[in-house]
Structure formats: structure tokens, C-alpha cells
Amino acid sequence: MPLLYCCPGFYLSSSVTRLLCVRLRNSVDLSRTGNRSVHSSTLRCAGQDWRVRRGFARSGSEYGPLTDLPDWSFADGRPAPPWKGQIRRKEEREALARRVVLLSTEMDQGMTNWHKKQQEMKAEQLQKEISKLKSKASPNKTTNT
């Protein structure tokens, strides 16, 4: 059986090449008719799970020194002007920090309100017990004999 040259170091038999040609032709025919199914699921980039599990960014270009620091500076030592992406990321971080502070203060305020309410409920319960009617024949009463 004659072997056909494919690429450096690889040779294919005629039956394999025939099979590949048939599959290629069928896929082209399917794409022309529009019956080919299209997947719409989200793609997971290579290594994304590994980076997320270790606490890194999902991609290497989200944040970090290579993304956040300027590529150059002036010869006299002045910093380079910030890029649009750097400005946008800085604004996003500031907005996130403001939201964290807002939610933290709301949480603290909610906790103080809850503690006040608990104290008021305890005081009210104590007041109810004090104002209850007492029985005349109390067991603590000592008799003089």
C-alpha cells in the first residue's frame, strides 16, 4: 500500500487520506446547507481554572504589574501619562472600594440597631416580670410563731 507524504516525518495511507477527504467534504456540505449545529456555550480559556484556584486573575492581562505599570517613562524620570485602560481600571477599583465601605457601614449600623433592639426586648421582658401581679401567699413569707 503506497504511503502519501503529509508533513515532515508523517506519511498517511491512501485509505486514511480518502477518509479525511470525505469528512472534509461532508463538513463543507453541511456548512453550506446551514444544518450544522452551532455551540453557544461559554469557552473556558486554557489555564483559567488553574489561575482562579490559586487566587490569580482569570487571564494574565486582567491585573498585575504587566498590566498596571507603564511600559515607559520620560528620560528625566517623570512618569508616563496613564492610559485609558489604566484610568478605567482605577475608576472601577475606586467604585468597588466605595461600595465595600458603604456596605460595611450599613452592616455595622444594622448590627448596632439589632443590639439595641435586643436590649430593648430584654428591658421590656424585665419590666413585664416586675409589673406582674404577685400572689398574696408567697412561699418566701416567714411566719412568726
Curated annotation (Swiss-Prot):
One of its GO terms (cellular component) is mitochondrial large ribosomal subunit. Keywords: Mitochondrion, Ribonucleoprotein, Ribosomal protein, Transit peptide. Residues 60-86, 110-145 are annotated as: Disordered. InterPro entries: Ribosomal_mL52. It is found in: Mitochondrion. Pfam families: MRPL52. The keyword Lyase does not apply. Residues 117-132 have a biased composition (Basic and acidic residues). GO terms for biological process: mitochondrial translation; translation. Residues 1-45 form a transit peptide. GO terms for molecular function: structural constituent of ribosome. Belongs to the mitochondrion-specific ribosomal protein mL52 family. Component of the mitochondrial ribosome large subunit (39S) which comprises a 16S rRNA and about 50 distinct proteins. This is Large ribosomal subunit protein mL52. It comes from Xenopus laevis (African clawed frog). The gene is mrpl52.
